[in-house]
């Protein structure tokens, strides 16, 4: 096998490991706010549980990255997939905030390892990195896009906990993909001491998480909750599944476009278009701009990892990928809190226009810093 073919195979297996584990998390995002009583928590506690996996990643991503690099993909992903299955079983059998909180923290670290593996293996060979990573994002999204509507329908008949027993078995199937991964360690850079200011890619990652994973997703649910008929859980599950379906269909296309035209150029172009769509979303063109944002987000997903790999070759690549993920998690954690505070009291146009302009500025700064 050529090095490119091996990289394609390893990236696919890593993506399948994450794709079979991820439904545990996305179903909890769908069901916990609606059925928090069934899980033995208040709505406020449900919000903390949903944020806990991101908060622990902000603190623990560096530790995960060092252990991932030291032990290699196979041990890291086997442990992470096993942890995902444990978390799913716990969601099915346990109730109460203090019993569910450790599961969310464990899942946060497990996701960090799986996500880092998909990015590192997707960019390990520079040739075709954007195409390879875009294809791996499609494999990752396959699990959630199937699990969300199935889980919504099962919940209506069997309650919100039964689906997690099914997802435990699905996650365990991910062990087969994880076993096929390489076990060789990755080179580790020297540990840096002291505070490092965010660079242009950090800033873009933060704003991307803030706008698209935070303000937009919460706004889509908050503003569109009365615009579609049918049961609330089915409608919400359909909306969330559409987001992942967009990744399946469009992320490979975005990767091929990045290989052809350059990931930095595509980053600027798509970010500017996203900024325009966000302004329209906040100004009243709700469904048309929401659809455009879903498309643009899916096209953008394969861009950042190849840019990071190109700018940070060698031992620093894994830590650089982890740093970008931390900043995106910070933005995605701040975004829902901002949306919850501002949407009931502030004009929609301003809520989305200001972050849109900042996102466009950050994308342009990424290209300028590369020169």
What are these regions (language model features)?
Residues 6-34, 197-216, 291:
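Pair of pore-lining "gating" transmembrane helices in MFS-fold secondary transporters
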